[in-house]
């Protein structure tokens, strides 16, 4: 009877696609007796776990969510006026429900395949247009990670672009303190001297300048003359700014800024204890080819119709590697989409109205605190006031706490207050009465009808140019309009809610609804990253427990959850290695060995950390070439800092010699960085911290179920062994500053990075338990081997382990087809769209191949559907091989086929329309139609347009 009363966890079979019966069939197909037997063939015995994970067992969804709700309740939701780059905002409910909570948006991958990504590309183009418009600059990228890292990227962009030969980057002391700290961290590995000072005292000789507009503590300054002075000495002017303020302020591009950066957080994205939020960067046209991050551009498709794509990809790490403009890979696409849609929803008039209201409320507050006898130190302001509270400061802060209000504590005698769009007249009265109480005075009754505050914007800083002039920002008149616009965009895209996304090295697994629910709870969403510690106990418990679980899973001793992408985790790990060597007096250790097959972020991150990259060859089996490794270690001698490897390898196999590789590097005085991108093949099976690695980053947006969001958000924790723990990223205090004892600076603007989505992996781990996590790994490996076995007859599987097995992904070699009849991996990738599939990873890690990772979440029926599609495509290739179809005019070369193509009055192709549209009978049920034909990449780069086209272009 007692068992009947127990809550039952049925999550594991809902997360894992194949049933136990299907698993048995699949094991029989690949010739293996059990999952345990499969692991024995795949995972080298020397690295396999000898004991199960010391984690609790699986639990039910109601139990886990109830516990998390109790944890969240330990956070205190105060009224926040801290500002400092983070502001209260209203997420439009139509965007909350139909974008943030919609798997059609949050389960998509980065739009590298533009033909099936036109919806989110259009939404990102809206975002880029919005940012470029508000900043008054020529071009904007499609998001960066946060304001602090965007400022750091601005510094490196300025270094690449400036005429000045100086190594000094001047940072205004009026910038947000967390931005200053992140910039300082980034500069350390790049031989850049950061000088923080007061720009009103004149500029030193420098290659770049970073200003804050408006100031962190509220002031608004006309920087036109300063920009002219900087340009006169060959320096680049960067400006960290506030998009809402720019609805009223002269845009930076008009007063001389070359680069503008910031965060779009206050455009509809809650605090989330620091993230995720979309950073932005805009710049002058002359800088576009040096700009970091992804860039959406307008091109045309094979039919001559407008089509969107990621432009100028040769700047990026996946192509340029250590010569890339940045190591950024995952950005903040989902949040950028939300911010762009916030602008579409409100339109130019609505945005001005919000900005004017915020500014007016700040003026009302200024009048009343001055009437109380306090001094407001900034005469100019947009939304923030610096108030000298003198000896009354402790009493004011006590009164604020009693009223559940957070003020920004600047120093012993001053506080700052930032107004946002959520502030009401009642809120304003409560805020004013906090100051009255602190001064021992009676409450004031606010009469909104009689208020007439003076404007706080000085001459020369008031915007005269229009905002959001493109028709898209005036097209939505009702929620019905918005709802249909969002549906139209979503219908253009292919995400996990439609079909599997078999991208190798990307781990596109289920993002379960139960995992997503907590991120919108107010107790998590409405916590400011610099709120006092006694208000964030729930978050701290979440962080501690998730950190402990991840350390148990990986075998490391300590972890930082601060990095807000995998690339940032890599960077943080390499900074830890750098700090460790320098603390030991081994400053000469600055060479990072990286296999030729490594992810592009690896060499890009090494370069940012101040290391030189030396490439190690791979052997014919896809493993690290031990002879070449030995030679390179001898060649670099005592300059060896680290080896970066991915495990299992990017070739989709567990290298048998990984422990020997680690031992050789350690013997030479180096450290081993193991890229955790493929951790989905090791959870519960092997612990990198126990078989020789010193540091790894994890991708919580891969292995631990944070959704990819169409290209972000992500979380890339960095886990280390004990000797590297002192060199993990520094955690900023409540003032946004780095404590003196920190050995390494922060890599993200918020103390715990994108803390607002950490509940997702916590829920996943809790629901799966130790046994479920291991089973997920086993089935991920089973699914990959099933696909490899079934397709090996049709496409060569390029690499396999000692027993002929792959790990959690497999590489299909398309090069023989390219050589014999000109059919490329790209042709097959585009043809898969006609079958309703996103392509596997193309040409990585080997050019001319397709890398398939099915993950554990795909069931046998979906695997068979993909396999059937690949077999059918191979039959179409055979038609070309036999001469039955033309080498240029065939279903592969012309793929994907749009409805417009197939409904044209004339059909000039040698194959029938039926074959183009419905190559398999199953496609007649729920056919996905690509909205555009194959996109012309070269045309888009030659004719770069990165803002919304006039509406006539789509007619």
UniProtKB/Swiss-Prot annotation:
Biological process according to GO: glycine decarboxylation via glycine cleavage system
UniProt KW keywords: Oxidoreductase, Pyridoxal phosphate
InterPro entries reported in the protein's UniProt record: GcvP (IPR003437), GDC-P_C (IPR049316), GDC-P_N (IPR049315), GDC_P (IPR020581), PyrdxlP-dep_Trfase (IPR015424), PyrdxlP-dep_Trfase_major (IPR015421), PyrdxlP-dep_Trfase_small (IPR015422)
Keyword set includes Oxidoreductase: yes
Required cofactor(s): pyridoxal 5'-phosphate
Reactions catalysed, as given in the entry: N(6)-[(R)-lipoyl]-L-lysyl-[glycine-cleavage complex H protein] + glycine + H(+) = N(6)-[(R)-S(8)-aminomethyldihydrolipoyl]-L-lysyl-[glycine-cleavage complex H protein] + CO2
Example of a GO cellular component annotation carried by this entry: glycine cleavage complex
Entry keyword annotation includes Oxidoreductase: yes
Modified residues (N6-(pyridoxal phosphate)lysine): 702
MF annotations from Gene Ontology: glycine binding; glycine dehydrogenase (decarboxylating) activity; pyridoxal phosphate binding
EC number from the UniProt entry: 1.4.4.2
Gene3D superfamilies in the cross-refs: Aspartate Aminotransferase, domain 1 (3.90.1150.10), Type I PLP-dependent aspartate aminotransferase-like (Major domain) (3.40.640.10)
Family: Belongs to the GcvP family.
Subunit annotation: The glycine cleavage system is composed of four proteins: P, T, L and H.
Function as written in the Swiss-Prot or TrEMBL entry: The glycine cleavage system catalyzes the degradation of glycine. The P protein binds the alpha-amino group of glycine through its pyridoxal phosphate cofactor; CO(2) is released and the remaining methylamine moiety is then transferred to the lipoamide cofactor of the H protein.
Protein name: Glycine dehydrogenase (decarboxylating)
Record organism: Bordetella avium (strain 197N)
């Amino acid at each position: 009877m007692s068992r009947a009363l127990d809550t039952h966890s049925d999550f594991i079979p809902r997360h894992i696609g194949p049933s136990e019966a299907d698993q048995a069939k699949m094991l029989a197909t690949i010739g293996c007796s059990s999952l345990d037997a499969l692991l024995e063939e795949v995972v080298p015995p020397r690295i396999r776990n000898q004991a199960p994970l010391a984690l609790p067992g699986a639990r039910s969804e109601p139990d886990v969510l109830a516990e998390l709700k109790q944890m969240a309740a330990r956070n205190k939701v105060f009224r926040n006026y801290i500002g400092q780059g983070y502001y209260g905002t209203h997420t439009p409910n139509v965007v909350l429900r139909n974008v943030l909570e919609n798997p059609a948006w949050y389960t998509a991958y980065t739009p590298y395949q533009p033909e099936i990504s036109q919806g989110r590309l259009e939404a990102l183009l809206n975002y880029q247009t919005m940012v470029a418009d508000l900043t008054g600059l020529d071009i904007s990228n499609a998001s960066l990670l946060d304001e602090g890292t965007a400022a750091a990227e601005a510094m490196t962009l300025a270094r690449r672009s400036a005429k000045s030969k100086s190594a000094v980057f001047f940072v205004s002391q009026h910038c947000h303190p967390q931005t200053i700290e992140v910039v300082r961290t980034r500069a350390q590995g790049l031989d850049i001297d950061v000088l923080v000072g007061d720009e009103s005292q004149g500029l030193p000789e420098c290659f770049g300048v970073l200003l804050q507009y408006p100031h962190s503590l509220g002031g608004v300054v006309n920087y036109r003359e300063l920009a002219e002075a900087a340009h006169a000495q060959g320096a680049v002017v960067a400006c960290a700014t506030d998009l809402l303020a720019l609805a009223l302020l002269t845009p930076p591009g008009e007063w001389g800024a070359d680069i503008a950066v910031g965060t779009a957080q206050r455009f509809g994205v809650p605090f989330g204890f620091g993230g995720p939020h979309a950073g932005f960067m805009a710049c002058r046209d002359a800088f576009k080819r040096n700009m970091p991050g992804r860039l959406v551009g307008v091109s045309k498709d094979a039919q001559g119709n407008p089509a969107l794509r990621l432009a100028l990809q040769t700047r990026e790490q996946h192509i340029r590697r250590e010569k890339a403009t940045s190591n950024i890979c995952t950005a903040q696409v989902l949040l950028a989409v939300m911010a762009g849609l916030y602008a579409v929803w409100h339109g130019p008039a609505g945005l001005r109205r919000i900005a004017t209201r915020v500014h007016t409320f700040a003026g009302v507050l200024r009048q009343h605190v001055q009437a109380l006898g306090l001094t407001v130190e900034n005469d100019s302001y947009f939304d923030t006031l610096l108030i000298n509270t003198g000896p009354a400061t402790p009493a004011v802060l006590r009164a604020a706490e009693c009223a559940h209000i957070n003020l920004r504590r600047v120093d012993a005698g001053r506080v700052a207050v930032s107004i946002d769009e959520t502030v009401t007249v009642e809120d304003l009265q409560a805020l004013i009465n906090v100051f009255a109480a602190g001064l021992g005075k009676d409450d004031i009754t606010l009469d909104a009808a009689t208020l007439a505050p003076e404007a706080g914007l000085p001459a020369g800083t008031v915007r005269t140019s229009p905002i959001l002039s493109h028709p898209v920002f005036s097209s939505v008149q009702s929620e019905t309009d918005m709802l249909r616009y969002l549906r139209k965009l979503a219908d253009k895209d292919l995400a996990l809610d439609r079909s599997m996304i078999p991208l190798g090295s990307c781990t596109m697994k289920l993002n379960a609804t139960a995992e997503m629910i907590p991120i919108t709870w107010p107790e998590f969403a409405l916590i400011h990253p610099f709120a006092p510690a006694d208000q964030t106990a729930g978050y701290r418990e979440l962080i501690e427990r998730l950190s402990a679980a991840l350390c148990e899973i990986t075998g490391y001793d300590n972890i930082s959850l601060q990095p807000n992408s995998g690339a940032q985790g890599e960077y943080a790990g390499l900074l830890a290695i750098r700090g460790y060597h320098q603390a030991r007096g081994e400053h000469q250790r600055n060479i990072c060995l990286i296999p030729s097959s490594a992810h592009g972020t690896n060499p890009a991150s090494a370069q940012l950390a101040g290391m030189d990259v030396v490439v190690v060859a791979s052997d014919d089996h896809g493993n690290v070439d031990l002879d070449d490794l030995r030679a390179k270690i001898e060649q670099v001698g005592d300059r060896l800092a680290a080896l970066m490897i991915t495990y299992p390898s990017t070739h989709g196999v567990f290298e048998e010699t990984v422990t020997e590789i680690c031992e050789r590097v350690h013997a030479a005085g180096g450290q081993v960085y193991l890229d955790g991108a493929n951790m989905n093949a090791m959870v519960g099976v092997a612990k990198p911290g126990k078989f020789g690695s010193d540091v790894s980053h994890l991708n919580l947006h891969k292995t631990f179920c944070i959704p990819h969001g169409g290209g972000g958000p992500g979380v890339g924790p960095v886990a280390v062994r004990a000797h590297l723990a002192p060199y993990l990223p520094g955690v900023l205090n409540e003032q946004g500053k780095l404590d003196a004892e920190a050995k390494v600076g922060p890599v993200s603007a918020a103390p715990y990075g994108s803390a607002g989505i950490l509940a997702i992996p916590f829920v996943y781990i809790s629901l799966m338990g130790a046994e479920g996590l291991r089973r997920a790994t086993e089935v991920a490996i089973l699914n990959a081997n099933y696909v490899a076995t079934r397709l090996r007859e049709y496409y060569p599987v390029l690499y396999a382990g000692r027993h002929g097995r792959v790990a959690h992904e497999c590489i299909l070699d398309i090069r023989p087809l390219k050589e014999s009849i000109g059919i490329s991996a790209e042709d097959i990738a585009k043809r898969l769209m006609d079958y309703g599939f996103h392509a596997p990873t193309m040409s990585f890690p080997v050019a001319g191949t397709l890398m398939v990772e099915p993950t554990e979440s795909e069931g046998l029926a979906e695997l068979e559907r993909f396999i059937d599609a690949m077999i059918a495509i191979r039959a179409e290739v055979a038609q070309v091989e036999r001469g039955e179809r033309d080498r240029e005019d065939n279903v592969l070369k012309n793929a994907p086929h749009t409805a417009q193509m197939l409904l044209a009055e004339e059909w000039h192709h040698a194959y029938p329309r039926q074959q183009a549209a419905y190559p398999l009978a199953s496609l007649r049920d729920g056919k996905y139609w690509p909205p555009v034909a194959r996109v012309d990449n070269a045309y888009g780069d030659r004719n770069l347009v990165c803002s919304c086209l006039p509406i006539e272009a789509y007619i």
